[in-house]
Amino acid sequence: MSQYSQNQYAGAYPTPPVSTGPYVAPPPLGYPTNDTTHATVAPVETKSKGEAADGFLKGCLATMLACCVLDACIF
């Protein structure tokens, strides 16, 4: 058996804080709260829906053109 008693380790860990009620999970990240300590962030500049679709369409057309060129060169 050990020569040390359990009472000697009582000071190693602080006592847990007294609970004032049930645990409530914090809101998800990005969820607006009443906390005003954070600095306001400038709004992010976004593209309109047409501009984003235009880039996607150009990418698809470029890919199709590259496939056609490769197909013509190989066969």
From Swiss-Prot:
Organism listed in the record: Arabidopsis thaliana (Mouse-ear cress)
Which family does the entry's similarity section mention? Belongs to the CYSTM1 family.
Q: Partners and quaternary state?
A: Heterodimers. Interacts with CYSTM7 and WIH1/CYSTM13.
Biological role: Involved in resistance to abiotic stress.
This entry's comment on induction and repression of expression is: Induced by heat in roots, but suppressed in shoots. Accumulates in response to cold, drought, oxidation stress and salt.
Query: Which residues, by range, are in coiled-coil regions?
Result: none
Q: In which tissues is it expressed?
A: Mostly expressed in roots, stems, rosette leaves and siliques and, to a lower extent, in flowers and cauline leaves.
- At the top level of its lineage, which domain of life is listed? Eukaryota
Gene that specifies this protein: CYSTM5
**Primary subcellular site in the record, as a coarse category:** membrane
Write out the entry's keywords from A to Z.
Cell membrane, Membrane, Nucleus, Transmembrane, Transmembrane helix
Annotated membrane-spanning segments are: 52-69
Describe its membrane topology: Single-pass membrane protein
| Localization annotation | Cell membrane; Nucleus
Name the Gene Ontology biological process terms: cellular response to hypoxia
User: Which GO cellular component terms, listed alphabetically, does the Swiss-Prot or TrEMBL entry include?
Assistant: cytoplasm; nucleus; plasma membrane
Protein name per its UniProtKB record:
Protein CYSTEINE-RICH TRANSMEMBRANE MODULE 5
Record bears the keyword Transmembrane: yes
Annotated signal peptide: none
Biased composition, Pro residues: where in the chain? 14-29
User: Where do the segments described as Disordered lie?
Assistant: 1-29
